[in-house]
Amino acid sequence: ETSEKRLEKVRFMNMCMISDNKGNVLALDKVGKNYSGTTFPGGHVEAGETFIESVIREVFEETGLTIKNPKLMGIYHWISGDVRNVGFLYRTDEFEGKLISSDEGRVYWISEKDYPKKSLAPGMQQVWQIMHSDVPMECLQTITEEGIIAKIQ
């Protein structure tokens, strides 16, 4: 193999499903030019951060909550131009603080049964499936002429 095939630009991301042990999950109605719809809190991993540090920081910035012991549920990745975006998906039911929305969008508790009925952001059906799996899962999303293909394994 050529080294070109082994080397690619990568952007690390994170997302966390937070549940309150009363049948509710925390939803974020994201408002943005590039990505909008109902999702979970999360964002970019900054240089020098661990993945867990980054998800704790992002959740705090977007919700005002401090999470503890996020559990890695899987990986969701997609190609955007010449960059592979790799999202680490976590879930937790341990948190403290007061819920505060940010400029990323409104955050609120919603029942687990109602969440999938929302106008979900792209890829969130697959993220939802990964978050509810008993084993870690991976999803690769590719965009083709026929549309978006999401391969879960």
Residue ranges and their predicted role:
Residues E1-V25, P41:
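Conserved N-terminal beta-strand and adjoining loop/helix that marks the start
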Residues I18, L89-D93, W109-S111:
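Short, well-ordered beta-strand micro-motif
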